[in-house]
Regions:
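Short, well-structured N-terminal submotif of metal-dependent ribonuclease cores
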Residues: 1-32, 42-58, 78, 130-132
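Generic structural signal for small/hydrophobic residues in well-ordered secondary structure
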Residues: 3-4, 40, 76, 101, ...
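Alpha-helix capping/helix-boundary segments
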Residues: 6-7, 36, 72, 97, ...
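Active-site neighborhoods of divalent-metal-dependent phosphate/nucleic-acid chemistry enzymes
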Residues: 54, 64-109
Length: 132
């Protein structure tokens, strides 16, 4: 599952390393959360850029956008309670995305490891942004 930062990178650099790495996977192995799609669409609309909005729509049309459903709500409650008790909360959108990915047993691909690594039981990766 791709988070908002990974999607944003694909928008900014559609021929980049991340896009190439994702291109080597089966198409049905790559998806995103409706929460990330909401964030991406909002960002494009807020900027008022027709070309950016078009790139966002093209990317989301090419991906499976998963609806937020049960048991993500249970994971959300558990994650939020745990992180708040530990004094290490994460942003509200990231919390929903983390709960969504964890509830489906998916690995979350992000450029925001610092935030998501705090979530217990969430498999998270950050693929290199550039070739080595």
């Amino acid at each position: 599952m791709l988070d908002t930062k990974a999607l944003s990178e694909l928008i900014r650099n559609p021929g980049g390393t991340l896009a190439q790495q994702l291109g080597s996977l089966e198409p049905d192995a790559v998806c995103t959360s409706i929460v990330a799609a909401c964030e991406l669409r909002f960002g494009a609309l807020r900027k008022g850029s027709a070309p950016l909005t078009q790139r966002v729509e093209q990317l989301l049309d090419a991906l499976t956008v998963l609806p937020l459903d049960s048991p993500a709500d249970e994971h959300y409650a558990d994650i939020r309670t745990t992180l708040e008790r530990n004094g290490t909360p994460i942003g509200s959108h990231d919390l929903f995305i983390a709960a969504h990915a964890r509830s489906r047993g998916m690995t979350l691909l992000t450029r925001n490891l610092r935030e998501f690594q705090r979530v217990p039981g969430l498999h998270v990766e950050d693929w290199p942004a550039t070739s080595t």
